[in-house]
Amino acid sequence: RFGTAEHWKRKLEEICGCPPLHLISQVEPIGPKRLLDILVIAPCTGNTLAKLAHSIADGPVTMAAKSHLRNGRPVLVAVSTNDGLSGAGENIGRLLARKHYYFVPFGQDDPLKKPTSLIADFAQIPQAMEGALAGQQIQPMLL
């Protein structure tokens, strides 16, 4: 729908100047080596929210979060899920109650056609990163 995985890998490498970390073995050292100041999960799907909320580290994204959190460093979540106001709502609540999780401000993307769908305002990622690095959730969080 949004392009091939290979296209996005190349694009990320262009932007960052290094290849993306997309294997569990590549992200495991994030925590022990303190490789990141902040980890941004964007977009964060309902499936990923559930895994984070239940501490399931079975792929590179969730393993990166687990590894990064061991040092008490911030994880910034940019929600993008069709069931944010239904099934995924509980998982958002769990993460809000935990230390070191921060959210990019989010709201309903189409209340009439998709009443339970939530989407982060991706334009606010830089500001949300600054807040998270300072230990603060930017407000308003709900748009």
Could you say what each language-model-derived stretch is?
Residues 1-59, 66-75, 82-143:
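A cross-family phosphate/adenosyl-ligand binding-site feature
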